[in-house]
Amino acid sequence: MLHSYSEYVDEGMSMKKDSKTAEAFANSWNNLPLGSVYSDKQVQDWLLPLKEKDFKNKRILELGCGNGSFLLHIINWEPLYLEGVDLGDSVISAKKNLEITQKNWDIIQADLTEYKGTNFDIVYCIGVLHHLKDPKKGFDAVIKNVKKNGIFHCWVYGKEGNALIIYFVDPLRKICCMLPWWYTKYCIATPLAILFLIYANLVAKFSFIKLTKLFPLYEYCLWISQREFSFFVHVSFDQLVTPQTNYIPKSTIQSWLRSCEYLEDWYIIQRNGNSWKFGGALRNDTIYRLQLLIR
């Protein structure tokens, strides 16, 4: 069985244009307890329309794996081989998390925008492209790692539905990303998480009133109100710790997909009213072709 932690030899690793973002998220991931911050239900939701059965006996690649929170769930879906790539030192936590299993996996420290593996049936990238200096380059990396007849799936923050975040939270992020991670997490993100917890739960409680549907982040509030407080803190900290965040409109995603020469089928699905899931199949086989949901 393969269990390892590898590093692409690259003398310029610390000079990569996304290295500051990778370092910020490594500070976030490496200061969490071992284990996944997500439930299996959350992981399944992020990956839909892909399902657990799609991963069985397949070679899987995650670009931007963080501490391995997604990998910890997918390893139980019986993939043939599972690989995670991340630029930051969060790969240390990912390796520790994956060491509990005796299955085939590898964790690689590398710039995902330049990484090229081999023969992956499914490549996914969750919550990473929007933090890159060049999100399109990240998308291109996803595509180039999918083998012929393979599948890819991504999730990004949307420009649509995020006005509150873009105009009020993002300016705060530009300040917080320069502060020590512990100060941002405990002195800023945690108090904001308390306020958002109250807001989200009030929106959910009174969702039977039609007027609440006009409130900012309505659909997102219905989703996150079901989560524990620690997840609110995790989300708030993630929003504030990074030096780079892009909010990507649907039209941009459409242009990415249409520029993909070998793409047979593709889909774009709005998630919780403020983000986009999208992906497709680089193949011709109608038996395994993805169902087109939204185009």
Label every model-predicted segment.
Residues 1-61, 65-118, 122, 246, ...:
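Conserved N-terminal segment of class I S-adenosyl-L-methionine
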Residues 90, 135-139, 156-158, 165:
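Catalytic cores of eukaryotic secretory-pathway lumenal/extracellular enzymes that build
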Residues 114, 130, 159:
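Active-site micro-motifs of SAM-dependent methyltransferase domains
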Residues 122-133:
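A short SAM/SAH-binding and catalytic strip from SAM-dependent methyltransferases
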Residues 136-148:
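A short glycine-rich, Lys/Arg-flanked "PGG" loop and its adjoining helix->strand segment in the class I
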Residues 151-190:
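Conserved class I S-adenosyl-L-methionine
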Residues 180-258:
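Substrate-binding/catalytic lobe of Class I Rossmann-like enzymes that use SAM or dcSAM, i.e.
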Residues 254-268:
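A SAM-dependent methyltransferase catalytic signature shared across enzymes that methylate proteins
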